[in-house]
Regions:
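Cytosolic regulatory regions of ion transport systems
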Residues: 1-457
Length: 457
């Protein structure tokens, strides 16, 4: 696939790195700043073009006439919209994806049409990140939570702790412990190495486990891997930007929320927008302020400022002052590494990985509803809808055990008529099924796409 990325910022460069894992992708990236392109050209097999991504002359230099997809992730919504307009009007590019963050535009979906602003898919990072954080807040004990089939089923990442029921026991015993719980382990990592999640695989302390489960069964399933955690009630948010405000609005009716914002005008704005949240104007690294506001009784501390450095520092401070759990929003790898090494940041949220996952679902062939990138882009969880009949589809009418799946691809579950069916070997695939799979190696995606595509008669 020939892909043109406009903007080599954090999202654009991360997307380029992820897409380069697939040798079949031919990637070109455009940016006005040469210094943003140099490291990408040095480390990745891509073409770079220095210039303004909305100018026709620059687009033509980048080879837009032969592109299958244009992805506009420049640091301006207006630039992204103009670039997509150019791609559509002048070059008839079939698929245009743009990052749009301004609420004023998002509230008027009628402007995103072929007659106005021809953008096929809108990516709104703040909304994606807010929903991602909501999933973690709703499931204490989970490191990551990914929705499939409108939240009916979720993929959960957690770690196995010593002294819990399944540690040092084979996976097959899970069903004995929880006969009424719909869940299945689909992926397992030990010391950063993938381990086949077979029925006789023994779970060890510290294993990173991914399991699929019905939403209302997740809390029960988590107890198999770690000590039960109480729900989060008192939540402290550092940073009142778009994400901090969105999270507070989402949670304030069901949780005790405090939000701290450095800017006086912004703090005033937050107090007008939030109904059941205590807004504090001050510095999130102010130890006395945190103590005065009862940080030692805080169930969850969310560091959501625009600064990686601030998020890491205030998370460490909050944990050492008594906060039960800390989550930090971190873009750059160097700060993510520091946060992990500190031992005081429980969960690191990568906004770029979340945004990239939102984009990837629009790049897959077939009827791909959801894509979630795992393990820094090396693995992937996907939801594909099956179409056709036994004549036009290689999978319809086949049992899961008979599917010619590539090595390392696991069918974890099937959603049929809004009912969750776990991926048992004898389950027969039907038209309309939503297949939930995990690919241990993202490079297998083309084999999976080809298998599930409906063939023309």
């Amino acid at each position: 696939m020939k892909i043109l990325i406009l903007g080599a910022g954090q999202v654009g460069s991360t997307l380029a790195r992820y897409l380069c894992l697939d040798d079949d992708n031919d990637i070109t990236i455009v940016d006005q700043k040469e210094e943003m392109l140099t490291p990408l050209q040095r480390h990745l097999d891509i073409k770079t073009v220095n210039g303004y991504g909305a100018y026709p002359s620059v687009l033509e230099k980048a080879g837009i006439k032969s592109m299958d997809v244009v992805i506009a992730v420049m640091n301006s919504d207006e630039r992204n919209m103009v670039a997509c307009r150019m791609a559509h009007t002048l070059y008839d590019v079939k698929k245009k994806i743009a990052r749009i963050r301004t609420t004023e535009y998002l509230l008027r979906p009628e402007i995103f049409t072929n007659d106005a602003l021809p953008i096929d898919f809108l990516i709104t990072p703040e909304n994606l990140i807010t929903e991602y954080i909501r999933g973690i807040v709703e499931e204490p004990g989970a490191s990551q939570v990914f929705d499939f089939e409108n939240g009916l089923v979720q993929l959960v990442e957690t770690r196995a702790f010593v002294g819990t029921p399944i540690v040092n026991r084979p996976i097959k015993e899970l069903q004995e412990h929880m006969p009424d719980v719909k869940m299945r382990i689909v992926s397992l990592y030990r010391n950063e190495r993938a381990i086949p999640a077979k029925s006789d695989t023994v779970i060890r302390e510290g294993d990173q486990v991914y399991f699929l489960a019905k939403k209302n069964h997740i809390s029960r399933a988590l107890k198999e891997f770690r000590r039960a955690e109480n729900d989060y009630h008192k939540i402290f948010i550092a940073g009142g930007g778009s994400i901090g405000l969105n999270v507070a609005q989402l949670l304030e009716d069901s949780h005790n929320i405090r939000i701290i914002e450095l800017g006086e005008e912004r703090a005033k704005y937050l107090s007008e927008k939030l109904n059941n949240t205590i807004v504090l104007q001050g510095n999130a690294s102010d130890e006395d302020l945190l103590k005065d506001e009862g940080i030692e009784n805080t169930d969850l501390f969310l560091a959501l400022t625009d600064s990686d450095e601030v998020n890491v520092i205030v998370s460490i401070l909050a944990k050492r002052l008594g906060a039960h759990k800390t989550i930090a929003l971190v873009k750059r790898d160097v700060y993510a590494s520091l946060a992990e090494q500190s031992g005081d940041v429980d969960i690191i949220v990568s906004p770029d990985q979340i945004t990239v996952s939102g984009i990837l679902s629009h790049l897959r062939k077939g009827d791909c509803m959801k894509v979630h990138s795992l393990q820094h882009g090396k693995s992937e969880a996907i939801e594909i809808v099956v179409h056709g009949d036994e004549k036009t589809s290689e999978v319809i009418g086949e049992q899961i055990k008979d599917l010619p799946l590539p090595e390392g691809v696991v069918v974890g579950a099937v959603v049929r008529d809004n009912e969750l069916l776990m991926g048992s070997k004898k389950l027969v695939i039907e038209s309309g099924d939503h297949i939930l799979m995990v690919l241990m190696d993202v490079r297998k995606i083309h084999e999976v796409e080809a298998l599930f595509l409906e063939n023309e008669q």
